Amino acid sequence: MASTEEIPRSLAGKVALITGAGRGIGKGIAIELAKRGASVIVNYNSADKPAQEVVDEIAKTGSRAIAIKADITKVPEVSRLFQEALQHFGHLDIVVSNSGTEVFKPEEEVTEEDYDRVFNLNTRAQFFVAQHAYIHLRNGGRIILMSSVAANMSGIPNHALYAGSKAAVEGFTRSFAVDAGHKKITVNAIAPGGVKTDMYDANAWHYVPGGKPGMPMEEIDKGLAAFCPLERVAVPQDIGRVVAFLAHPDSEWVNGQIILLTGGSIT
C-alpha cells in the first residue's frame, strides 16, 4: 500500500492521456501520474460528475487536468479526443489505454452483439487508441495498454470472450513496440488480476473457488487474498504506481512487455 511520504514530481512537464479515467483503475492511474507532476487528460464516456471529481482531485496535487468526453469505440471520437488534448496542452507524452468491460457468459449463449460489444471496447478501441498515440506522441513517449491476467488463465468457466479480447491486446503490444521504436516510443501492457473497483464488485466472485452470486464482499476478498503472498487484493493505486514507473524515462529498457500485476498471486 502507498506510504504518506512526499512523492518526487518526476513526470513534471509530461502530458498524459488516460482513457476510462473517470473511475476505477483509470482514476487510480490518473491520480498517481498527477502526483508525480504530469498534466492529465481524463477521458470518459458517460458520467460527467465522476470525471470532474477526478479533475478536481488532480488539482489538489498541484497538477493540471481536463476531462474530455469521447466514446473510444468510434474512431472519429478517438481522433477528436486526441485533437482536443493536443489543442489544450500542446503535446502528448504518455497514453494509457485503460477502458474495458468484462463478461462471463456460457459460450453457447454468446451472441454477435455480445461479441461486438466486448471486442469493440477491449480490443478494437485499444488498437485505434494505440495507433493515434503512435502518430501523435512526442519522441520518447510511452504507450501503455490494458490486458488482464485472464488472457493467460485456465480453468475459469464462461470467460472465452473476455480472455480472448485481452489476449489480442498482448499481440498488439509486441507489434507496436517494434513499429514505434524509431520514435523511441516504448509500448507495454499491464495485466492486472483482481482490483477493487465496481467491476471487481460485480464479477470477482467468479474467481473464488465455490463462489456464487450474492457472496458477501468480505468473503470474496478473503478468498482471493488467500492466493496472494501479500495477503490482500489490489486497489487502483497499486496499478497506478506501476504505470507511473512505465511512464518515467527510467523505464526505457522495458519495451514490448506484458507485465503481470497480481502481487504474486498463484493463478
UniProtKB/Swiss-Prot annotation:
GO terms for molecular function: oxidoreductase activity. Its EC number is 1.1.-.-. It is an enzyme of class 1 (oxidoreductase). Keywords: NADP, Oxidoreductase. It comes from the Eukaryota. InterPro entries: NAD(P)-bd_dom_sf, Sc_DH/Rdtase_CS, SDR_fam. NADP(+) binds at I25, N45, D71, N98, Y162, K166, V195, T197. The active site is at S147, S148, Y162, K166. Belongs to the short-chain dehydrogenases/reductases (SDR) family. Hydroxynaphthalene reductase-like protein; part of the Pks2 gene cluster that mediates the formation of infectious structures (appressoria), enabling these fungi to kill insects faster. The product of the Pks2 gene cluster is different from the one of Pks1 and has still not been identified. PANTHER family: OXIDOREDUCTASE, SHORT-CHAIN DEHYDROGENASE/REDUCTASE FAMILY (AFU_ORTHOLOGUE AFUA_5G02870), SHORT-CHAIN DEHYDROGENASE_REDUCTASE FAMILY PROTEIN. This is Hydroxynaphthalene reductase-like protein Arp2. It comes from Metarhizium acridum (strain CQMa 102). The lineage of its organism: Eukaryota, Fungi, Dikarya, Ascomycota, Pezizomycotina.
